[in-house]
């Protein structure tokens, strides 16, 4: 693996997708080979799994099923899209990766971070990001953003009650503490222009 693998993490409404779209032009104009992708998804098989995971009517989905589906989507996306790009010296910007599973299924769903981490170690063959940016935001603020975004389709996880979203944030903060060597916490409750500038600085300071 020769490229740089940067993952962007955060609760619902933290601005991950918008941030990545703001980062792309900066690195492109610097003639850095850069690729944006997302989880679950990014390639056909994983997008199909994403559809299943996000369907509002699948409220009966059991936590282990959910965790295994995310890991399956992650595996296919990694081998089909991420690894080939890294081997061609790309900077890969990925919207979510293993830390999402630790926060959502490991902590918020109560499966245990260690168990979920082992599932994902198997799925990824211990491939970890070069750097992770965690966008921290209060759940109420993030969910309010989602409610105002008419273009965003509400998915099954968005529909969880506020206590679930609070547990997700608590889980993320534990993940940040556990993997402090590669995760940088950034306050997401600020104008997007300032957030983009701050994250560019972090990426350049840490990796470039």
UniProtKB/Swiss-Prot annotation:
According to its UniProt record, which protein family does this protein belong to?
Belongs to the thymidylate kinase family.
Question: Which InterPro entries does this entry report, sorted A to Z?
Answer: P-loop_NTPase, Thymidylate_kin-like_dom, Thymidylate_kin_CS, Thymidylate_kinase
Q: What does this protein do?
A: Phosphorylation of dTMP to form dTDP in both de novo and salvage pathways of dTTP synthesis.
Question: PANTHER family annotated for this entry?
Answer: THYMIDYLATE KINASE, UMP-CMP KINASE 2, MITOCHONDRIAL
Organism for this UniProt entry: Bacillus cereus (strain Q1)
Q: Which UniProt keywords apply?
A: ATP-binding, Kinase, Nucleotide biosynthesis, Nucleotide-binding, Transferase
Q: List the GO cellular component terms.
A: cytosol
| Identification of the protein by name | Thymidylate kinase
* Name of the coding gene: tmk
In Gene Ontology terms, what is one molecular function of this protein?
Answer: dTMP kinase activity
Q: What is its EC number?
A: 2.7.4.9
Q: Which residues bind ATP?
A: 10-17
Reactions performed catalytically: dTMP + ATP = dTDP + ADP
Q: Which GO terms describe its biological process?
A: dTDP biosynthetic process; dTTP biosynthetic process; dUDP biosynthetic process
Does the entry feature the keyword Transferase, yes or no? yes
């Amino acid at each position: 693996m020769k490229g740089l693998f940067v993952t962007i993490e955060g609760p619902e409404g933290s601005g991950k997708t918008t941030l990545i779209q703001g980062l792309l032009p900066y690195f492109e104009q610097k003639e850095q080979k850069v690729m944006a992708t997302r989880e679950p998804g990014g390639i056909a098989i994983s997008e199909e799994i994403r559809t299943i995971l996000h369907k509002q009517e699948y409220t009966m989905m059991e936590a282990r099923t959910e965790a295994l589906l995310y890991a399956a989507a992650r595996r296919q996306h990694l081998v089909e899209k991420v690894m080939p790009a890294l081997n061609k010296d790309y900077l890969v910007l990925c919207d979510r990766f293993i830390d999402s599973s630790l926060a959502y299924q490991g902590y918020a769903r109560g499966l245990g971070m260690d168990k979920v981490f082992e599932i994902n170690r198997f799925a990824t063959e211990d491939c970890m990001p070069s750097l992770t940016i965690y966008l921290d935001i209060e759940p109420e603020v993030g969910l309010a953003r989602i409610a105002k975004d008419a273009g965003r389709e509400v998915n099954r996880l968005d529909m969880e009650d506020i206590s679930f979203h609070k547990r997700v944030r608590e889980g993320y903060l534990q993940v940040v503490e556990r993997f402090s060597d590669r995760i940088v916490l950034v306050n997401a409750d600020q104008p997007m222009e300032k957030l983009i500038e701050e994250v560019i600085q972090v990426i350049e300071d840490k990796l470039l």
